[in-house]
Each structure stands twice: as structure tokens, then as C-alpha cells.
């Protein structure tokens, strides 16, 4: 087999830049087990500047090659790219659109699937259209007195709500509201992160996650794992990634077989129904009454030391390096 030049593009310059670098470390370790790959790690910053791991300034060109600022270095042709970028521009569909424009094969969900999942409003419309239960919500498209009134009414009806920036990941721009006096300031904060905002009913429930991925010709959904937050708190960005986080996880949640199989069925249905590709982490709520509600889809899940996706894949009996190898070779028709 001829060597494959694989670009591991990471960072992105968004709110989740640092987490993307941690996930890239996991990819780098996994790819190192595949000797037919030549891997070049390049970091993309908030200004759109590229820099290789060894410090050379460079850029990805429309000719599908890395060109270096130091012209004594030969251009590096790119056969395949893994865009290890959480949040913007990696999970928003932006960078996938560019790859599609220059006909560069890449790993992960396509541009449309990424956009549809990243925007919480669009995603919930898809969930409902596919007949998958999800949390009651309303959406707002501007910060004004009407938006404040609608949110106040929702709080009165539901007792507690979450205000979420519609186009953010990892709980960025997401706030719990229990007091109407909080609403104006919290809406202002949420609209700072996104031009659209979702207001959801607070669900007192267990938080379950499923790793979904395409492997050996089928869509695989693992047994659900569980995130357990200290004192019933919300799994915030800080709780996910802080060194002193009190949140704990279980790779396999303690639920009945019936619940587990229904969650897996919903996960496969939404993955296939939204025409997602390669991998996603799909998050659910399980209420004390046994109601299952789809919460959200992460089209490029974290692969940090504390992340659930790689642990659930391994627990299912699959090897991440071999899974990657199949996806790469299939994408290159080899």
C-alpha cells in the first residue's frame, strides 16, 4: 500500500480550542499505530493562521497541499484530513464545506449534518420530525421585551428552564434559570454567543450518553454510559474539563435492558435519519418515570482523557485505531 499523507488539523481558535488540542493528542497516538500513514499535525488559530507541530507557519491550499512559509520546504500533498476541531469551525459545517469545495476527503460528519446538529433549534426540529422524544422548548431570535416575556412565561409554566445559545457546544452559553429576575441578564449573555437562543424545560433526570459510529458496514450504538454531576448540578463546560471537577462517569449505565435498547434504537434512528457519518456522541435524559428524551448530538465528540466516547467504543469491543483505519481507507476508496 502506498503511504497516505494525513493532515491532523486541530485547534480552530474558538471557545473549545484547548479541548481540541487534547483530542488531537488521542488521534495522534491512535494514528501512530497505523504505519502506512504519514501524519502531519497542524494547528489552526483564531486568525486563520496555520502552524505545524514543529513550529513552521503554513497554509492549506485549494490544491490540497500544505505550503510552508519557509519556501525551502517542499509543499506537502494532503490525501485525507481529520478536522479535530470542537465547536467553530469544526462542528458547525464551515470547515467541511471548504473540504468539499476543494474535493478533499475528510473524517467525520459532512457539512449539512454538522450544521443541523450544531444548531440546537434545527436539531430539535429534526428530532421531532423523526419521532424521537426531546425536551419541551421555545426559541428566540432577538433580545427584546417579547423574548423576556416569553421566557418569563416558560419559567412560570415549567418551574425552571435552561437558556441556551443555539449555536454553541460543550455547554458554552448555557444557563439554568430558577428566578425571573435572572432572565434579562442571562438572555443577554446567551445572545452574546449566538443570534438564536433556545429556552428548554429543566428536566430532572439522569444524563446518559451513547457512542455511535459506522464500522464494518453498520451503524453501531454502544450501551449507554452515564454522567453523574455532584449534587444534581448541570454538566457545565467547567464541570466537563476542570481539573477539580466533581462530576463522575460510568462507561455502562445501570439501567434496565429495555431502557438501554430503546436508547440505542433512538440513537441509531437519529444518526441514520439525519445522515450523519463516521461518529457522533448522542446524549439523552432518563427521567425518574422512565421517560427517554433526546438531548443533543455532538458530531465530533471529545477524545480527551476524561471523554466517554473512546471508553464506550473500547467497552463495545472495538479498537479505535482499526476503526479509524477503515474510515480512512473507505474514504479514499482503497
Swiss-Prot record:
Q: Which residues of this UniProt protein bind Mg(2+) 2? A: 296, 298
PANTHER family found in the cross-reference section: D-ALANINE--D-ALANINE LIGASE, D-ALANINE--D-ALANINE LIGASE A
Q: What are the recorded GO MF terms, alphabetically?
A: ATP binding; D-alanine-D-alanine ligase activity; metal ion binding
Gene Ontology process terms (BP): cell wall organization; peptidoglycan biosynthetic process; regulation of cell shape
Recorded family membership: Belongs to the D-alanine--D-alanine ligase family.
Instruction: Report if keyword Cytoplasm is assigned.
Output: yes
Q: Can you say what this protein is called?
A: D-alanine--D-alanine ligase
Kindly state which reaction or reactions the protein catalyses.
2 D-alanine + ATP = D-alanyl-D-alanine + ADP + phosphate + H(+)
For this UniProt record, the keywords arranged alphabetically read as follows: ATP-binding, Cell shape, Cell wall biogenesis/degradation, Cytoplasm, Ligase, Magnesium, Manganese, Metal-binding, Nucleotide-binding, Peptidoglycan synthesis
Q: What is its EC number?
A: 6.3.2.4
- What does the record give as cofactor? Mg(2+); Mn(2+)
- HAMAP family (alphabetical): Dala_Dala_lig
| Subcellular locations according to the entry | Cytoplasm
The domain of life for this entry's organism is Bacteria
Q: What is one term from the GO cellular component aspect held by the record? A: cytosol
Question: What does the function comment of this entry state?
Answer: Cell wall formation.
For the ligand (Mg(2+) 1), the binding residues are 283, 296
Q: Which residues form the ATP-grasp domain?
A: 124-329
Sorted alphabetically, which InterPro entries does this protein's record hold?
Answer: ATP-grasp, ATP_grasp_subdomain_1, D-Ala_lig_Van_CS, D_ala_D_ala, Dala_Dala_lig_C, Dala_Dala_lig_N, PreATP-grasp_dom_sf
Name the top EC class.
ligase
Write down how the cofactor binds this protein.
Binds 2 magnesium or manganese ions per subunit.
**Residue sites binding ATP per the record:** 154-209
Q: Which Pfam families match?
A: Dala_Dala_lig_C, Dala_Dala_lig_N
Named in its record, the pathway it takes part in is: Cell wall biogenesis; peptidoglycan biosynthesis
